[in-house]
Amino acid sequence: MTHNQELIETIIADQVHQELHSIQDFLRWTYSTFNRSDIYYGHGYNNAWDEALQLILTTLALPIDFPNEYYAAHLTRSEKEVLLRLIIQRLEKRIPVAYLTHQAWFCGLNFYVDERVIVPRSPISALIQEGFAPLLPQEPKRILDMCTGSGCIAIACAERFPEAEVDAVDLSSDALDVAQINIERHNMLDRVYPIQSDLFHDLAKDQYDLIVANPPYVDLEDLSDMPAEFHHEPEMALGSGVDGLEITKKILYAAPDYLTEQGVLVCEVGNSMVHLIEQYPDVPFNWVELKNGGVGVFALTQAELMQYRHLFQ
């Protein structure tokens, strides 16, 4: 029996729902329970408190900034039962909270998510909020979000640059269905356009001022060692060959044909940055310092991509 299974048996045996009455009771108890468990935090939240807060308030249809003075409000029996069922799922099946609530936050915006897409967590969010300064010479009018998934990066870019149009590309029709939900939720039907394509294969020869790419980049070794929570995400959105760079190299090779002369590619490769640096020591990757933490995001100009293109064949 695993440690989490022991916790679940204790929850059932103690008939917790009879002793917990208020929002505050459930927050404290859930926080303690998560702290005692061996669940992994890394899908939008990095600690037990934030996960407990998100799970409970979202499930109760309450805002995350719900006033503390109302935390003493009592819950109905049915609300308690729903919360306990979700908490047990989090412990037993190691399902990320975002999939349990179907809600995730990115750049201060709320997105619908389910297991057809990975949970939004890209450190590129910091660059979006800063308007990609100082990487861009001017505000972009045309943006391409490659490997869009839930559409969070595309929509956040459209919010940050009100005059821009954004193409949101993904190979997965399932992912694009989720992106469409979010495009409609954020009233972006006339500015964010979902496109099914194997990278650039089915795109018109448009030119973009900015290409943002968050492709699969987990290498084979890391993929096999990932915590159970990651196995609920679509594998095609995580792994990318032995070195994690199979898809990134294709993007690097094709991107200059789709960028304006002043255009910039911003791409996330996470821990696979080590392999990228080793394989291409002569390429002047601009590894961006991210104010919210995180590593593995680089920028290259159209001219740089064209100059070193022969290396990515």
From Swiss-Prot:
Q: Which UniProt keywords apply?
A: Methyltransferase, S-adenosyl-L-methionine, Transferase
Question: Which GO-annotated molecular functions does the record name?
Answer: nucleic acid binding; protein-glutamine N-methyltransferase activity
Q: Which GO terms describe its biological process?
A: methylation
Q: Its domain of life?
A: Bacteria
Q: Provide the reaction this enzyme catalyses.
A: L-glutaminyl-[ribosomal protein uL3] + S-adenosyl-L-methionine = N(5)-methyl-L-glutaminyl-[ribosomal protein uL3] + S-adenosyl-L-homocysteine + H(+)
Instruction: Please give the InterPro entries that the UniProt record associates with this protein.
Output: DNA_methylase_N6_adenine_CS, HemK-like, Ribosome_uL3_MTase, SAM-dependent_MTases_sf, Small_mtfrase_dom
**What's the Enzyme Commission number for this chain?**
2.1.1.298
Record has Transferase as a keyword: yes
Annotated Gene Ontology cellular components are: cytosol
Gene3D superfamilies (alphabetical)? DNA helicase RuvA subunit, C-terminal domain (1.10.8.10), Vaccinia Virus protein VP39 (3.40.50.150)
Which CDD domains does the protein's record reference? AdoMet_MTases
Enumerate the Pfam families for this protein: MTS
Family in the record:
Belongs to the protein N5-glutamine methyltransferase family. PrmB subfamily.
Report the protein's function: Methylates large ribosomal subunit protein uL3 on a specific glutamine residue.
Q: What is this protein called?
A: Ribosomal protein uL3 glutamine methyltransferase
